[in-house]
Amino acid sequence: MTTVYYDQSVTKDALQGKKVAIIGYGSQGHAHAQNLKDNGYDVIIGIRPGCSFDKAKDDGFEVYPVDEAAKQADVIMVLLPDEIQGQVYKEEIEPNLEANNALVFAHGFNIHFGVIQPPENVDVFLVAPKGPGHLVRRTFAEGSAVPALFAVEQDPSGEARDLALSYAKGIGATRAGVLETSFKEETETDLFGEQAVLCGGTTKLVQSGFETLVEAGYQPEIAYFEVLHEMKLIVDLMYEGGMENMRYSISNTAEFGDYVSGPRIITPDVKDNMKAVLDDIQKGNFSDRFIKDNQNNFEEFHKLREEQHGHQIEAVGRELRDMMPFIKSKSIEK
């Protein structure tokens, strides 16, 4: 069992007296910046001109272009989309790094796959909250927190680990617990979870179930309720108490069907396909494909997105959600 670090575990405040630059002021950026500021740390924001620039100023921060923020800071947290981090780092951050600066990430993609290669005299570590930015901020304000992972990749200063834990405590994560990992483990497991289960696996499972019912002559609206709408109810039960809690909470009919039909859907072949997905991630095949498509203006990405937008389940869902005012609809119109 891995060690979990809590507030009382972090006795040295290695972040005190250092200037922290948060690069990016999106979902994670605003949460990290505001939590650190509320805990008394010296925080500046580095972003390009735009709406986020104005928002950060309105929130009371000193806001600078990325290169100037990097030049001023001792600790630089990069909270930009994966696909633009490499260019921003090369053009605006790297020229302004000094020995014993700390370069920090919330996801290991660009370090692990070599897109960003920091100089050897710079600390490199990761602090990755396991939740979206709005939840990181809201739970902090309520006195609780979202758990996080941390990892150290380079430690020329000898204090990267202390800095990582101090940063995690600064954003509130040690209230809930912080687990140590590596850039390799965080990156590969995160990508696998997204592709095989949370996003890719779940969406294809739901779509296939919907299509099976509709093709068999059932009403699309009924199919939507059975395979998508009720998904949240089941996931919430697992989230709150694991699979045992879910099975305890459903009917005996549903539980029996779980046992006898689940293995018919998720067969050994499906697990073999999952292993192939993991292998692609580990070998860098997925990252190469993503990076090359980014360099090609995301031609494949945009094509795939457009194909999925037109699926019948989306149109049916938009109509049904209009019937349920208790759902805060977030339909994406194009």
From Swiss-Prot:
Which EC numbers does the record give?
1.1.1.86
Query: Could you say which protein family the record assigns here?
Result: Belongs to the ketol-acid reductoisomerase family.
Swiss-Prot/TrEMBL catalytic activity: (2R)-2,3-dihydroxy-3-methylbutanoate + NADP(+) = (2S)-2-acetolactate + NADPH + H(+); (2R,3R)-2,3-dihydroxy-3-methylpentanoate + NADP(+) = (S)-2-ethyl-2-hydroxy-3-oxobutanoate + NADPH + H(+)
Q: Name one Pfam family in it.
A: KARI_C
The answer on whether this UniProt entry bears the keyword Amino-acid biosynthesis reads: yes
Q: Which residues form the KARI N-terminal Rossmann domain?
A: 1-181
Tell me a Gene Ontology molecular-function term this record carries.
Answer: NADP binding
Query: Which pathway is this protein assigned to?
Result: Amino-acid biosynthesis; L-isoleucine biosynthesis; L-isoleucine from 2-oxobutanoate: step 2/4; Amino-acid biosynthesis; L-valine biosynthesis; L-valine from pyruvate: step 2/4
Q: Keywords, A to Z?
A: Amino-acid biosynthesis, Branched-chain amino acid biosynthesis, Magnesium, Metal-binding, NADP, Oxidoreductase
Q: Which residues bind Mg(2+) 2?
A: 190, 226, 230
Lineage, top-rank taxon, reads Bacteria
Q: Where is the KARI C-terminal knotted domain?
A: 182-327
Binding residues annotated for substrate, in chain numbering: 251
Name of the protein in its database record: Ketol-acid reductoisomerase (NADP(+))
Kinase as a keyword? no
